[in-house]
Amino acid sequence: MSQSPIELKGSNFTLSVVHLHNDQPEIILQALQEKVEQAPDFLKNAPVVINISALPADADLKALHHAIDSAGFRIVGMSGCRDEQQRRAVIKASLPLLSEGKKQKTSAKEDKPAEPAIKKTRVINLPVRSGQRIYAQGSDLIVTSNVSAGAELIADGNIHIYGMMRGRALAGASGDQECLVFCTHLNAELISIAGQYWLGDKIPTELAGKAAKLSLVNNELTIEPLI
């Protein structure tokens, strides 16, 4: 029996979500270009989801699409549609519409709190080389060796690096803002928690190459030394 020329499979990808708070294409273009200039290797031609929940229903989505594309981003889906008018506008603009699960109604009866799920931890005991990408889906990630520039660590949970960190670390990739990044020798190109990120030049000079912990406080990255 001949093999089918195509095969559809489910998969998981880490995508950034761009929340638009302005419907003027020129303003969006300038803001995105500034972001790309800050981290060209990370953001140029990056696939993104566009959230339009803050935009008016009559926003020109075609013009916004052109602005986002011109800035070097590639739209893989639109989210945040508040009503049918916005959904029709997305479809009319020939943009992919992502379906979002409906929130479950709260039961009148108080259910017993579920036991917290035990997270598995992915452990990497070898050096992570430039160009390598490691993703710990649904778990924490521990690296016990060095991470080279150009390497990328991604985890839905926390990230621990027990070695020299020169690459990129993205914790809380599924949106968990309580995730942390721990590093014994911090010289990262980029650190991100739940989509909020710092480039390497944002790391305080007194902590460069030192042991540090990064977390989110009021939706902003903060850093403190590890004693």
Curated annotation (Swiss-Prot):
It comes from the Bacteria. The gene is minC. This is Probable septum site-determining protein MinC. Transmembrane segments: none annotated. InterPro entries: CAP/MinC_C, MinC, MinC_C_sf, MinC_N, Septum_form_inhib_MinC_C. Pfam families: MinC_C, MinC_N. It comes from Photorhabdus laumondii subsp. laumondii (strain DSM 15139 / CIP 105565 / TT01) (Photorhabdus luminescens subsp. laumondii). Keywords: Cell cycle, Cell division, Septation. Belongs to the MinC family. PANTHER family: SEPTUM SITE-DETERMINING PROTEIN MINC. GO terms for biological process: cell morphogenesis; division septum assembly; regulation of cell division; regulation of cell septum assembly. Interacts with MinD and FtsZ.
